[in-house]
Amino acid sequence: MTNKHHKSKKQEPAGPERILPKPNAKIRVNILYDDGHVLALDKPVGLPTQPGRGHIDDTLVNAAFATHGEALSKLGADRDWGLLHRLDMDVGGVVLMGLTDIGYDSVRAQFEDRTIAKKYLAIAHNAPPADTGRCTRELAEVIRGDMKVSVHVPRGGEEAQTRWKVLSKSKTHCLLEVEPLTGRLHQIRAHLAMVGCPIVGERVYRAELPPNTSRAPAGRSQEPLLLQAWEIEFRCVAGTRQRVRSKLGIDMLQFATQQRWQIPV
């Protein structure tokens, strides 16, 4: 017998990441790799990776749905509509998506067991203590002001490892090849700042900036963050290793040219 006083539980609305993304052909994104199982896209700087608060149909995922919507729809929300990892909005470069169950699951497993090789390029202030090295400071996520950030804690943090190599340098700046060996929030940005090399354009991990804001202080222009997801190497479904690279972004290219550095290709 039904209890007339019983109230059915109101179902919470699905978040943007659970709703089938709308295709948006107006967003132009270069396809770097497509073997029918895995897709690699070159995310532009300033483009959100996936739908979320304030960005429902103007993201990389929406662009991917315009070209590969049928395959991505079949993967569904449980497989993040094919999205295998994310980049901050301020960061451009290679992003991988699965196009089939086997393609998604294979690369997802490689991320989890850390057999994916990811390399970033960063232009930073100063120079690290050595031309090659590694930062292993543990990181913990905390809320500061209007955003979530990563900070070093002596106990209770998560393992974080970032390897760097100096490619070029001047008296005031350096061009770094950076390899995150773990995947913590803002890991590269936080670790480089900790070794005295904040990335050019950094608005969060800078000693002279307020620690509780992601916006530039009054009177200071908001210059671009010179960090790029440059290269990813993974094992494809066929079993061979594939290396995918993005071209150096315009802001980083201009800075490197002004410094007369050799341009990575």
Which role fits each region the language model picked out?
Residues 175, 263-264:
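Acidic, low-complexity Ser/Thr/Gly/Pro-rich repeat segments typical of extracellular/periplasmic
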Residues 56-65, 100-101, 112, 141, ...:
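Pseudouridine synthase
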Residues 155-160, 204-208:
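PP2C/PPM family metal-dependent serine/threonine protein phosphatase catalytic domain
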Residues 164:
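Long C-terminal interaction/binding lobes of large macromolecular proteins
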Residues 85, 132-133, 157, 186, ...:
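Residues that recognize and position ribonucleotide moieties
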Residues 125, 167, 179, 235-237:
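A generic structural motif
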Residues 26, 78, 159-161, 173-175, ...:
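Short coil/loop residues immediately preceding or within conserved phosphate-binding loops
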Residues 1-148, 155, 169-171, 241, ...:
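RNA pseudouridine synthases
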